[in-house]
């Protein structure tokens, strides 16, 4: 019955823990109340035992020892089953956690893919907004026509738009990240709160249980003390009673012996028998009563002792191990046991003595019945009794000592209790600290929520600001419309006013012209009167001459004597002199009048010139203002058009933003489901962001390169504009550049400091890495030492095994020897003794086998530890290998970056070469312009030569037609009237134009002011927006830093948890040690119990010994169970350690990835530093170049000013020379009268000199002609050189362009040809200078000769002197021209030097352009000056030719007269000859006087006319010069104003850009600081992890020490076993005597042994099941790890595909940006060509008056041609756009195909993984379902298992499906007798969200992935649920945005859904 009862109880205990319910994976409770125990039949008065953690003190014992053993066995079985069930539940929990983690990873991968595809879709949307790409139009027409000035606005608007888009994207991404982080943080906090709550509950429950146990133990100890005291007293009493009884027995024996001696033999025998029987009866009674009482007390004590032992074991499992004290207690118990045995032996000997004495009495009575005699007791008996008494006394003393020791132990236990209480207090403190940290984290969460709200408020504010900006835009449009209306009105008003003012001015000019004409007519009349008076005077002089002739005739007639003739001659001479004086006075008067006329004429010509200059200036102003007005109108139109475009784009963007916001709201539900995927996908996003940023940087670099290439095209047309703009802005830009350079230097200094800090941190990291490597090496050495120690331990274990084998052999031999001796001694009971011995031998063998199994289990534990250590070593080696691979990756990255930098340097060199080519092209164009100007000059020279020929012809005509002067005068007057009329008309037109231009300028200024105000408002708004964005960035950075701090705090908490787990594992090890020690103490106590029971009786002693043997067996079984529990615990510990290792791996991966990110960020910072350094170096170089160019410009300006001063000095010298000439002319006239007397004397010398001088003049003329020819040849050669230079430049430009297109340009082209030509020119100029010097020497000689022959100069010499003076003046002017030529040479040299400098510098176009423009202007001025000089030289040459002709004629006349005189002089024939001579002389004199008068009059007339003509020409020239100067001044003013406006605009834009750059830099700096803080925190965490690893190593060392201690303990235990073997040898002798009594109980023992064997078999079967389950779990873990690796590979492939697509898209975007910029630059080029054409037309100001209409027509034609070219260029651009679009479409199709392939592969892999998991779960469920039957099976059928997962909804419909992966749901989900199915809420929510999202927007890649995910989940659920739910279908009818997908895609989707 007892067996059946125990079996039923075992069944009940097995069935009760099977039904396990769990609401969550956090807590698992063993529900023992689910099954009613009433259903189970329990009989035989057996009780039900509750399954509690502590063993209660109310255990009911049976009536016999057999019942006690069965009850203890049931308790152990129950405990074992409970622990197994707990282990199974823990395994289920772990597997469920693993499944949840895997599902989280899968979801995170999916979410990352969705986010990446969203980013791609967002980039597509932005591309659609930013680029207006037409898909279908074949012909391309420009949407807007903008000038160069408007292009800047367009570029700025594009930049602002791009920035706005980027900010919008960043804000949306940050919002999504914030929401995602918030949700993830909330989920983590909820999980941690649950974990903390469960831990707190467990700790409170544990502490309460421990306190209860300690109190119970304390009570039990007190009870034990009392029992020991009672036992002591009872033993003392028993010993005293025994002493008394022994004394009485001895006395009675002595009395009986005396009586026997005295009495008779028969009576004595009877009496003796009776007395002996009575004595024996009394002795037995006295002995039985106390022994029976002690046996009952002993049983009670043993029960309580067992309870105390168990509780002490539990206490020691929680407290510190006190092995030494337990060993001392065991030794004391052994001593008491030995003493007890000795006492039992003593009592047995007494009994033997009594029996022997009784037998001896009988024998003596039989033998010596006849002989009377006495018998004395032997002395040995007395000695033995005395020894026993002495031993008893010593034992009593020893027991007293033990009591004292027990008191000390009680004190120690009290101290332990206090220690446990202190530990409890510490745990309470830790709990309080944990709660505080939880509160802090909750506060941080609240702060994060607040900040999120703030960010949302800021976003609302940004939206309101956007609305305000739109309103402002509308206002601007209205203002622009008003301005256009105002401009139109102002145009009409201005034109009307200008017409009116022109009419008024015309009238005024006409009045002035009439007044001038009246004045001129009056003056002409006066001149005619004077001419008439002079004629009358001439008539008088003629009459006087006639009278003189008559007188001369009368004198000839009357001369008879020479004296009378001579006197008469003298008188006539005197009369002639008087007449000459009168004529001189008259001539002086005439000259004065001529001077006055000349002054008046000069004033009039000056006024006319001024008027003409004013008219020209006004015309130029009119043209410029009209052009500016047109440009402004175009700008306004473009601005309005751009504003409209921007409004449309903003509306599109807003619509897209609204759509995105709706999509975001629709997809929030999906984001909630995919929250757990965020942590895994965030790293991917970060890597993708880094890739995107690197790609953006590459895009920006490529864009910069494209911009540079495009700027090369624009620079060809924008040179003149840039020159005019940058001429005056250099100084301001220099100052600003200085300030910018200072700021950049400060930034550089700060960046260098930061770089130094980063370098120091990098050094610290390297040092930490070295330290970590050293630690790893040390750990490796320690591990080697541990391995050696383990090997030593293994050898020691083997030696111990050998010793045990030897001991077994010795024991077997001893038993055989004992049995042999026993067989020889006892022949009666041989069979029984043999059987008994066999049983004992079997029992001993089983004991030894159990010990061997224990040792093997210890061996297995050590081997497992060794394996764990080896795994750790392998992991460390893997970590080292990973670090090496990472180092190699970093090296490769650095190499790639270096290659990229080299490529960038190559691109920069290409840019620089292209710039040099542009400069050369510009120079060639300038050379072409110079050629054109030189050709124009040649045409002008030819024209001037023609004019000279015409002037010569006119002079001849004037000489021949002297009578026609009056008619010519009338013609000239008419022409002057016409000119005046034209001048007045031009004035009126000019004034009208001026007024119009002023009005237009005023209106334009107002419009510009308004535009500037609008721009300022927009800039203020932009700055405010930038500030807000910066504030948002700062808040976001703060949020990220806080989140990182929270993450680091969480990591620290996790580390603390790991430490606490390690301590708990150490405590568990200590508990295991204590349990082993307590087991040994239990064994010793069982032995003591068996020895105490032997003291009752021999039979009871044998029974008690058997009970002790059974207890030892039970203890062995309990040890086996404990070992199994240890195995389970070790498995759990290994799993936990594996989990920890995995966590550490994950953390290590996190750290590695963070470290990579930080390295990448450091590299980026380095790149930024390099870029900043490059920018600073460029800025410095630009400043240096600007400074150099400023110096050059200043020097050139100084040179120009010096030249201007020289020209002024030359003009003054010319004036002085004219005055000097006039003075000399007067002096010459005076000297003619004085030198007339001397003329006859020096005629001969004069004739010779004249002939010589004539030859010299001819030589000079020839030389002059040669020099002119040489100049012409030089000019032609210069022009040819320029042409060749231009051709060479064009050829070089083309060659370099071809090279730059195909190959990188190598070196710059030398200008050797230009240098050679310049050298030729220099040599020719030197030759001309030599000739000039020769001319000067010859002129000096002529002057000297003239000074020597001054006395012999005649009247005609005065004319010659004037001619010489004119020649001298011409030579002076020629010298000036030569000086100017020398200056031109110097300028050419300077130009050559500048060209060389430009070739050397090659980096800054602006400075080169400025210098080039200045040089061109200087050359233009010099050319103009040379033209003026050439005109002057030509005029002087004409004058000199006229003079030469006059001199020749006069020379011929002089020679004829001389010949006549010579013929007349030698002959002296008397008075007739003298008279004839006198008459001839008189006639000659009259003819000479007549000719002189005629010549004088002609000279005066010609000089007056020439002077008038010269004055007119000079006045016209002056007026033209003034007009040109005024035009230049006006142009400069206008250009300066426009440049100032543009520079202001540029500076404002630059300031805005600089502010934005500063804001970006500050934001970036803050980000870097935050990242540095994060890096430092991560470094601290890394250090913390290192310290933890060190602590873990220390713990391992401690464990090794514990292992060594266990080793020593095992050795001590072996020693104790040897001692026990000795005691067993002693007991063997006793057992031989007891074998006869134990034979009866053999059958009961055999039955019990069979029961135990059956139980052992059951335990082994259960152990095999557990092992199978463990193997299955390991297989599942391996499968899941493989799946994770597959998913990681898929993720890597997806990342590669995404990166490739992103790179392709970036390339496409680059090409599109390049095309757009080319379009814009072409627009700029067209505008700049128009401006250059206008400037060229303005530069040709001299021909503007005559060629305005032609130029307008040419301009219109050119504009039409440019427009046609523009249309062609735009068509080309459109074609390129189409090609790019087609390529984009192809790439998008490829992307879609790749994505579809990826999705299909993912779906397939996911389906395969889910199928595999479902199969595994079904298999495991089917394997685990065989255990339950009966009512338990009904419970399992009633409780359907469901997985607690989020995505993989595995549902089982079979009632028998039970698995270790799943737990029983609550009553809400499951009911008894019914099947319940559960679909996760994630599928429903995802279905709803997908349907909603597909109704709005086009089908994107993310929707495809969601559809596939839904399909996969539905398919998985269908397979798990036997297709309980159909797959969800997407509503495709609502999809709008793109065309339907191809049929293949639909078929694939249908196939996936059907699968």
UniProtKB/Swiss-Prot annotation:
Coiled-coil ranges from the UniProt annotation: 82-129, 152-317, 385-1747, 1770-1813
GO biological process, one term: cell division
Keyword entries, A-Z: Cell cycle, Cell division, Centromere, Chromosome, Coiled coil, Cytoplasm, Cytoskeleton, Kinetochore, Meiosis, Mitosis
Spans annotated as Disordered: 1865-1896, 1912-1955
Matching InterPro entries: Rootletin-like_CC (IPR055167)
Domain of life: Eukaryota
Keyword Cell cycle: yes
Composition bias type Polar residues, residue spans: 1878-1896
Locations listed in the record: Cytoplasm, Cytoskeleton, Microtubule organizing center, Centrosome; Chromosome, Centromere, Kinetochore; Cytoplasm, Cytoskeleton, Spindle; Chromosome, Centromere
Biased composition (Basic residues): 1938-1948
Hydrolase among keywords: no
One GO cellular component term: kinetochore
Principal location: cytoplasm
Function according to Swiss-Prot or TrEMBL: May play a role in the organization of the spindle apparatus and its interaction with the centromeres.
Listed name of the protein: 227 kDa spindle- and centromere-associated protein
Source organism: Parascaris univalens
């Amino acid at each position: 019955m007892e067996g059946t009862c125990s079996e039923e109880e075992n069944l009940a205990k097995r069935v009760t823990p099977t039904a396990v319910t769990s609401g969550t994976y956090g807590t698992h409770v063993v529900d023992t109340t689910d099954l009613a125990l009433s259903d189970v039949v329990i009989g035989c008065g057996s009780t039900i035992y509750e399954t509690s953690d502590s063993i209660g003190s109310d255990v009911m014992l049976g009536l016999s020892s057999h019942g006690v053993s069965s009850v203890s066995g049931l308790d152990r079985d129950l405990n074992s089953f409970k622990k197994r069930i707990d282990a199974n539940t823990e395994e289920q929990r772990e597997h469920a956690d693993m499944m949840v983690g895997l599902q989280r990873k899968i979801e995170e991968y999916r979410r990352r893919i969705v986010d990446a595809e969203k980013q791609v879709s967002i980039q597509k949307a932005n591309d659609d907004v930013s680029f207006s790409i037409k898909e279908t139009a074949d012909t391309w027409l420009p949407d807007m026509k903008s000038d160069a000035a408007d292009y800047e606005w367009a570029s700025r608007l594009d930049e602002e738009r791009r920035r706005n888009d980027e900010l919008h994207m960043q804000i949306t991404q940050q919002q999504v990240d914030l929401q995602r982080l918030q949700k993830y943080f909330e989920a983590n906090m909820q999980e941690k709160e649950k974990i903390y709550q469960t831990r707190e509950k467990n700790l409170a429950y544990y502490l309460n249980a421990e306190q209860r146990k300690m109190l119970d133990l304390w009570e039990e100890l007190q009870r034990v003390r009392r029992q020991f005291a009672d036992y002591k007293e009872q033993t003392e009493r028993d010993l005293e009673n025994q002493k008394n009884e022994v004394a009485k027995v001895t006395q009675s024996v002595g009395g009986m012996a005396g009586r026997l001696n005295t009495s008779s033999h028969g009576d004595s025998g009877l009496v003796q028998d009776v007395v002996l029987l009575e004595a024996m009866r009394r002795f037995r009674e006295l002995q039985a009563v106390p022994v029976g009482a002690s046996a009952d007390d002993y049983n009670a004590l043993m029960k309580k002792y067992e309870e105390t032992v168990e509780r002490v074991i539990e206490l020691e499992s929680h407290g510190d191990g006190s092995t030494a004290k337990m060993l001392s207690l065991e030794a004391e118990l052994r001593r008491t046991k030995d003493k007890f045995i000795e006492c039992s032996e003593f009592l047995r000997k007494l009994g033997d003595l009594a029996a022997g004495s009784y037998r001896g009495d009988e024998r003596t009575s039989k033998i010596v019945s006849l002989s009377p005699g006495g018998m004395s007791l032997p002395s040995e008996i007395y000695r033995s009794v005395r020894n026993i008494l002495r031993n008893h006394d010593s034992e009593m003393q020893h027991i007293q000592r033990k009591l004292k020791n027990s008191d000390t132990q009680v004190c120690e236990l009290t101290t332990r209790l206090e220690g446990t209480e202190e530990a409890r207090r510490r745990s309470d403190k830790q709990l309080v600290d944990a709660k505080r940290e939880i509160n802090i984290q909750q506060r941080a969460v609240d702060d994060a929520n607040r900040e999120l709200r703030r960010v949302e408020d800021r976003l609302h504010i940004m939206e309101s600001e956007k609305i305000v900006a739109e309103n402002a835009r509308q206002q601007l449009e209205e203002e622009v419309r008003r301005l256009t209306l105002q401009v139109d009105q102002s145009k009409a008003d201005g034109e009307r006013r200008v017409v009116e003012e022109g009419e008024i001015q015309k009238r005024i000019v006409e009045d002035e012209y009439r007044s001038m004409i009246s004045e001129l007519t009056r003056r002409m009349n006066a001149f005619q009167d004077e001419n008439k008076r002079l004629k009358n005077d001439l008539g008088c002089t003629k009459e006087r001459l006639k009278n003189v002739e008559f007188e001369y005739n009368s004198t000839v007639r009357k001369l008879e004597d020479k004296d009378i003739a001579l006197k008469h001659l003298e008188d006539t001479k005197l009369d002639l002199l008087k007449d000459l004086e009168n004529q001189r006075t008259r001539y002086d008067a005439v000259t004065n009048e001529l001077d006055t006329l000349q002054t008046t004429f000069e004033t009039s010509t000056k006024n006319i010139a001024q008027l003409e200059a004013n008219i020209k200036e006004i015309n130029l102003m009119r043209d410029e203002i009209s052009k500016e007005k047109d440009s402004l109108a175009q700008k306004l139109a473009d601005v309005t058009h751009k504003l409209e475009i921007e409004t449309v784009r903003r509306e599109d963007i807003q619509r897209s933003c609204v759509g995105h916001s709706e999509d975001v709201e629709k997809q929030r539900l999906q984001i909630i489901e995919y929250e757990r995927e965020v942590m895994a996908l965030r790293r991917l996003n970060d890597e993708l962001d880094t890739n995107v940023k690197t790609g953006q940087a590459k895009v920006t670099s490529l864009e910069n390169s494209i911009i540079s290439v495009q700027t090369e095209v624009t620079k060809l047309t924008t040179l003149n504009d840039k020159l005019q703009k940058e001429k005056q802005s250099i100084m301001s830009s220099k100052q600003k550049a200085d300030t910018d350079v200072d700021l950049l230097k400060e930034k550089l200094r700060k960046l260098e400091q930061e770089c130094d800090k980063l370098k120091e941190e990098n050094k610290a990291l390297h040092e930490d890495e070295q330290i970590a490597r050293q630690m790893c090496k040390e750990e490796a050495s320690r591990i080697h030492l541990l391995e050696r120690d383990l090997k030593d331990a293994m050898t020691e274990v083997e030696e111990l095994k050998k010793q045990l084998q030897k001991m077994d052999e010795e024991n077997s031999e001893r038993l055989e020897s004992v049995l042999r001796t026993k067989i020889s001694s006892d022949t009666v009971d041989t069979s029984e003794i043999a059987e008994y011995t066999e049983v004992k031998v079997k029992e001993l063998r089983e004991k030894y086998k159990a010990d061997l199994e224990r040792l093997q289990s210890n061996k297995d534990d050590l081997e497992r530890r060794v394996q764990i250590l080896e795994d750790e070593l392998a992991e460390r080696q893997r970590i080292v290998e990973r670090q090496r691979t990472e180092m190699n990756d970093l090296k490769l990255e650095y190499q790639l970056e270096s290659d990229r930098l080299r490529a960038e340097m190559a691109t920069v060199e290409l840019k620089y070469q292209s710039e040099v080519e542009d400069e050369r092209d510009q120079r060639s164009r300038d050379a072409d312009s110079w050629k054109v100007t030189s050709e124009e000059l040649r045409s002008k020279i030819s024209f001037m030569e023609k004019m000279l020929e015409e002037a010569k012809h006119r002079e001849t005509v004037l000489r021949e037609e002297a009578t026609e002067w009056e008619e010519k005068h009338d013609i000239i007057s008419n022409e002057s009237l016409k000119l005046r009329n034209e001048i007045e008309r031009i004035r009126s037109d000019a004034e009208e134009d001026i007024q119009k231009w002023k009005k237009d300028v005023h209106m334009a200024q107002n419009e510009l002011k308004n535009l500037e105000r609008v721009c300022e408002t927009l800039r203020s708004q932009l700055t405010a927006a930038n500030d807000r964005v910066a504030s948002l960035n700062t808040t976001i950075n703060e949020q990220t830093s806080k989140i990182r701090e929270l993450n680091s705090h969480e990591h620290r908490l996790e580390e603390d948890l790991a430490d606490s787990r390690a301590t708990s594992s150490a405590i568990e090890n200590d508990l295991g040690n204590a349990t082993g020690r307590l087991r040994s103490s239990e064994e010793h106590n069982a032995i003591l119990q068996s020895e105490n029971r032997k003291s009752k009786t021999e039979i009871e002693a044998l029974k008690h010994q058997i009970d002790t043997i059974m207890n030892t067996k039970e203890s062995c079984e309990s040890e086996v169970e404990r070992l199994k529990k240890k195995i389970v615990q070790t498995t759990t510990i290994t799993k936990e350690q594996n989990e920890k290792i995995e966590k550490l791996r994950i953390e290590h991966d996190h750290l590695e990835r963070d470290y990579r990110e930080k390295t990448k960020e450091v590299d980026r910072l380095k790149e930024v530093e390099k870029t900043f350094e490059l920018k600073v170096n460029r800025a410095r170089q630009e400043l240096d170049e600007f400074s150099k160019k400023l110096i050059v410009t200043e020097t050139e300006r100084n040179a120009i000013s010096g030249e201007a001063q020289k020209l002024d000095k030359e003009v003054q010298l010319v004036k002085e020379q004219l005055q000097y000439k006039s003075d000399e002319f007067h002096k010459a006239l005076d000297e003619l009268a004085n030198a007339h007397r001397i003329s006859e004397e020096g005629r001969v010398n004069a004739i010779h000199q004249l002939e010589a001088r004539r030859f010299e003049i001819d030589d000079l003329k020839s030389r002059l002609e040669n020099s002119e020819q040489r100049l012409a040849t030089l000019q032609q050669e210069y022009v040819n050189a320029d042409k060749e230079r231009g051709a060479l430049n064009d050829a070089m430009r083309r060659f370099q362009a071809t090279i730059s297109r195909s190959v990188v340009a190598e070196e710059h082209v030398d200008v050797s040809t230009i240098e050679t030509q310049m050298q030729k020119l220099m040599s020719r100029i030197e030759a001309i200078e030599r000739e000039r010097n020769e001319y000067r020497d010859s002129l000096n000689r002529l002057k000297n000769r003239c000074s020597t022959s001054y006395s012999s100069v005649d009247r005609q010499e005065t004319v010659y002197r004037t001619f010489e003076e004119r020649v001298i003046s011409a030579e002076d002017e020629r010298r000036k021209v030569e000086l100017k030529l020398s200056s031109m040479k110097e300028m050419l040299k300077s130009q050559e030097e500048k060209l060389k400098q430009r070739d050397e510098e090659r980096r800054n176009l602006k400075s080169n352009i400025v210098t080039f423009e200045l040089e061109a202007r200087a050359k233009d001025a010099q050319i103009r000056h040379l033209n003026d000089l050439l005109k002057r030289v030509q005029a002087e040459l004409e004058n000199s030719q006229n003079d030469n002709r006059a001199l020749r004629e006069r020379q011929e006349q002089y020679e004829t007269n001389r010949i006549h005189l010579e013929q007349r002089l030698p002959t002296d024939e008397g008075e007739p000859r003298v008279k004839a001579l006198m008459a001839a002389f008189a006639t000659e004199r009259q003819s000479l006087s007549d000719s002189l008068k005629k010549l004088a009059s002609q000279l005066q007339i010609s000089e007056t006319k020439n002077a008038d003509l010269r004055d007119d020409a000079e006045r016209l020239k002056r007026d033209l010069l003034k007009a040109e100067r005024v035009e230049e001044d006006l142009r400069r003013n206008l250009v300066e104003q426009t440049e100032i406006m543009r520079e202001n605009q540029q500076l404002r834009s630059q300031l805005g850009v600089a502010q934005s750059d500063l804001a970006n830099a500050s934001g970036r700096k803050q980000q870097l600081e935050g990242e540095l803080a994060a890096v430092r925190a991560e470094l601290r965490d890394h250090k913390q992890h290192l310290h933890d690893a060190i602590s873990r190593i220390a713990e391992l060392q401690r464990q090794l020490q514990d292992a060594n201690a266990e080793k020593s303990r095992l050795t001590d235990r072996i020693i104790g076993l040897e001692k026990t073997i000795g005691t067993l040898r002693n007991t063997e002798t006793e057992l031989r005597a007891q074998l006869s009594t134990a034979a009866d109980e053999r059958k009961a023992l055999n039955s019990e042994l069979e029961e135990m064997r059956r139980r052992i078999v059951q335990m082994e079967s259960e152990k095999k099941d557990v092992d199978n389950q463990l193997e299955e779990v390991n297989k599942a873990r391996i499968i899941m790890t493989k799946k994770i690796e597959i998913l990681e590979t898929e993720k890597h492939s997806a990342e590669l595909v995404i990166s490739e697509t992103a790179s392709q898209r970036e390339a496409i975007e680059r090409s599109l940006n390049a095309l757009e910029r080319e379009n814009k630059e072409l627009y700029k080029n067209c505008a700049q060509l128009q401006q250059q054409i206008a400037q060229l037309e303005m530069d040709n100001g001299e021909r503007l008056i005559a060629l305005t209409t032609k130029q307008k027509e040419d301009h219109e034609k050119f504009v039409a041609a440019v427009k046609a070219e523009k249309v062609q260029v735009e068509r080309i651009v459109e074609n390129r756009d189409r090609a790019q679009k087609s390529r984009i479409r192809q790439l998008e199709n490829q992307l879609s195909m790749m994505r579809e392939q990826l999705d299909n592969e993912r779906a397939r892999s996911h389906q395969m993984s889910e199928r595999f998991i479902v199969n595994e779960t079904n298999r495991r469920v089917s394997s685990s379902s065989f255990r339950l039957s009966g009512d338990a099976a009904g419970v399992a059928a009633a409780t359907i298992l469901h997985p607690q997962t989020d995505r993989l909804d595995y549902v089982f419909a079979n009632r028998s499906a039970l698995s270790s992966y799943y737990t029983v749901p609550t009553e809400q989900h499951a009911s008894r007798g019914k099947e319940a199915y559960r679909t996760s809420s994630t599928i429903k929510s995802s279905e709803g969200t997908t349907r909603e999202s597909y109704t709005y927007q086009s089908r994107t890649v993310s929707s495809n992935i969601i559809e596939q995910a839904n399909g996969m989940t539905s398919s998985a659920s269908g397979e798990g649920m036997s297709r309980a739910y159909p797959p969800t279908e997407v509503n495709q009818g609502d999809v709008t945005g793109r065309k339907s997908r191809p049929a293949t895609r639909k078929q694939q989707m249908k196939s996936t859904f059907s699968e």
